Design a protein with these regions (language model features):
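Surface-exposed edge beta-strand/loop patches
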Residues: 1-55, 59-142
């Protein structure tokens, strides 16, 4: 029974991966929110014919030491809360000292004008089986 519930909690793993096709353009957004000393910025959206790729950049003050290296290896992960009518998938992250950029693929493609959209990013302590940490970052586009 436990296996059934674990499989249900990993539904995202069983959805087909969205592969953006035929790049169209970049849509600049540049909206930021600061929470607990970290600056979260929705920098831009890459538009494709069949999907959009959202970039969430996180920036904070960090120095390099052994504790920082250990912390970096255990960074929390973010998921984009599903937008009504859209399929949202995490597409990885990358970064370095004091910064990381998360990518999310949304299908079908978002409109070029995302005014009125509210993007909510939920923090998890692990990619797949992690628990929500309670931190939610909301970036509203006016």
């Amino acid at each position: 029974m436990l296996t059934v519930f674990q499989a249900l909690s990993m539904e995202e793993l069983y959805n087909p991966k969205i592969e953006p096709q035929n790049f169209l353009k970049h849509v600049p957004v540049l909206k930021s929110v600061e929470v607990e000393g970290r600056l979260y910025t929705l920098t831009f959206i890459r538009q494709f014919e069949n999907a959009s790729v959202i970039h969430l950049h996180v920036d904070w003050n960090e120095t390099v030491d052994m504790e920082t290296i250990h912390t970096r290896m255990n960074r929390p992960k973010f998921k984009l809360r599903a937008l009504e009518g859209y399929n949202c998938q995490s597409d990885g992250a990358g970064g370095g000292t004091g910064r990381v950029t998360h990518r999310f693929t949304v299908s079908p493609a978002l409109p070029d004008d995302v005014s009125g959209f509210s993007f909510i990013f939920e923090e998890y302590d692990d990619n797949w089986m992690g628990e929500k940490t309670g931190l939610e970052i909301e970036i509203k586009i006016s």
